[in-house]
Amino acid sequence: MATETLTYVKQANVQEYKHEKQPDISYHPDKDKWRQRTARRLGENPSLPLTPLPQGFPEQIESSLVWEGKDWKDESEWVYNLSIDQLEEIDAAVNHFHGLGLHLGHASQSTFPLPTLGPVLRSLSQELHSGRGFFVLRTLPVDSYSRSDIVLIYAGISSYVAPTRGRQDKEGGVLSHIKDLSTSQPAGSIGGPAYTTDKQVFHTDIGDVVSLFALETAKEGGISRISSSWRVYNELAKKRPDLIKTLAEPWAVDGFGADPPYTSRPLLYYLDQKLIIQYARRYFTGFLALPRSSNIPPITEAQAEALDTLHFLAEEFSLGLNFQKGD
């Protein structure tokens, strides 16, 4: 087992780091800069690919969670289509919940009964943990319900897949909206790509299971790309174990003005025979109104290469999910 832990470490005696230079890296990965940085670092130290893996990390992972986009031939392999009977069961669960007079936060398997669909959802949950790691449920009649009832259905169905909801923000919200705010908010007030039409780069969200509900079909684009982090790991472990070592060491995670101004933790862990990667690029590069803070340690050249390598390998092995309204 690896010696790293998931603990966030608060930093004391934070200094000004303006004299230390942040690498030439931005939120949007630049393939040419990545290739140049890789060539430069390997030229300076040709032995980097010979670096031993961190203690406890496997040379390769064998699992159904290791896959490439080309392994999937048709969306019928990951899309589960709801039947008319199952949609009627969901509607009955909505009416049952309203009859209880409870707040939306009480949506659960007991308050949102799905006697026949529930076991199917539990089976799909097992597919997340022990199978391919993803699925699409298609499709809920969004226009037939109020937004409040849509949230109820989302929470009720999700409770059969992952019964414990995680906080999305410091206020304790468990539901976040992905919406373009660039036309209604000042240009300098948006610090996250989820609130623009900008392309989001590969990242992981906090939580064991992450779900999305599509309220509309995109007029343009709209494909959501996912990738197997375990497949990316195998490629790195084989060709660039030094970057595995870099990812498994502490990184300064920007707090963007919080107290403390940054926390220190690895991005990559191997615990209980499972690989865990937890990162979002903007905490190391900044994004629009939230640039990388100047009073925290800049990332290193090795870390910059690791970030870009993660992205471009994930992109290479990715699968596109074409979300439809109600998915």
Name each model-derived stretch.
Residues 2-117, 122-123, 130, 135, ...:
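Active-site environment of non-heme Fe oxygenases that use a 2-His-1-carboxylate facial triad
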Residues 154-164:
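A short alpha->loop->secondary-structure connector
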Residues 165-170:
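Contiguous, non-catalytic segments that form substrate-binding/exosite surfaces or channel walls
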